[in-house]
């Protein structure tokens, strides 16, 4: 009879432990009911890129001195810089500058080491095309600034309201490359 009593006691303890585990998991499940959804409806809602996001490269033709530092620091020698030497002023004249984003790894070395700051990273990350040759951007395409996600009224931006409270006017007045 003694082993039977200890068996009932063990069974009762296991039942109480199982009920406690189920209760704890149910409390965790209920704590998630008042949170915002994590997923977004992509084409209609976009998350705001962080300040140091490395998107498409923006190029300012007038600032470039054709020093080719960007080509030397690029791990895959990607930027193509065409220039000619002006003998009367003894300076390089930039003729053509292009980057093929089909091969670019968006490491940001070219932006960081540029002595004249003619290269900068933008928030643009939608570079998909049907033809890979369209990803080869010349100086005209690189010079276009992307439309800011924040300023576009057709797109609803997704902010994590529980962690960051951002004033929309403050975002529009900030001096980012996309708001010039």
From Swiss-Prot:
Keyword Transmembrane part of the UniProt annotation: no
EC number(s) recorded for this UniProt protein: 7.1.1.-
Gene Ontology annotations of biological process type: photosynthesis, light reaction
Protein residues bound to [4Fe-4S] cluster 1: 64, 67, 70, 114
Compartments (UniProt record): Plastid, Chloroplast thylakoid membrane
InterPro entries: 4Fe4S_Fe-S-bd (IPR017896), 4Fe4S_Fe_S_CS (IPR017900), NADH_quinone_OxRdtase_chainI (IPR010226), NDHI (IPR004497)
An annotated GO cellular component: chloroplast thylakoid membrane
Membrane topology field: Peripheral membrane protein
Catalysed reaction, written as an equation: a plastoquinone + NADH + (n+1) H(+)(in) = a plastoquinol + NAD(+) + n H(+)(out); a plastoquinone + NADPH + (n+1) H(+)(in) = a plastoquinol + NADP(+) + n H(+)(out)
Cofactor(s), by name: [4Fe-4S] cluster
Cross-referenced PROSITE patterns: 4FE4S_FER_1, 4FE4S_FER_2
Entry keyword annotation includes Lipoprotein: no
Co-factor binding comment: Binds 2 [4Fe-4S] clusters per subunit.
Binding site residues for [4Fe-4S] cluster 2: 74, 104, 107, 110
Superkingdom of the organism of origin: Eukaryota
Assigned keywords, A-Z: 4Fe-4S, Chloroplast, Iron, Iron-sulfur, Membrane, Metal-binding, NAD, NADP, Plastid, Plastoquinone, Quinone, Repeat, Thylakoid, Translocase
GO molecular function, one term: NADH dehydrogenase (ubiquinone) activity
4Fe-4S ferredoxin-type domain mapped to chain residues: 55-84, 95-124
Family indicated by similarity: Belongs to the complex I 23 kDa subunit family.
Biological role: NDH shuttles electrons from NAD(P)H:plastoquinone, via FMN and iron-sulfur (Fe-S) centers, to quinones in the photosynthetic chain and possibly in a chloroplast respiratory chain. The immediate electron acceptor for the enzyme in this species is believed to be plastoquinone. Couples the redox reaction to proton translocation, and thus conserves the redox energy in a proton gradient.
Subunit and interaction comment: NDH is composed of at least 16 different subunits, 5 of which are encoded in the nucleus.
Protein name per UniProt: NAD(P)H-quinone oxidoreductase subunit I, chloroplastic
Protein source organism: Dioscorea elephantipes (Elephant's foot yam)
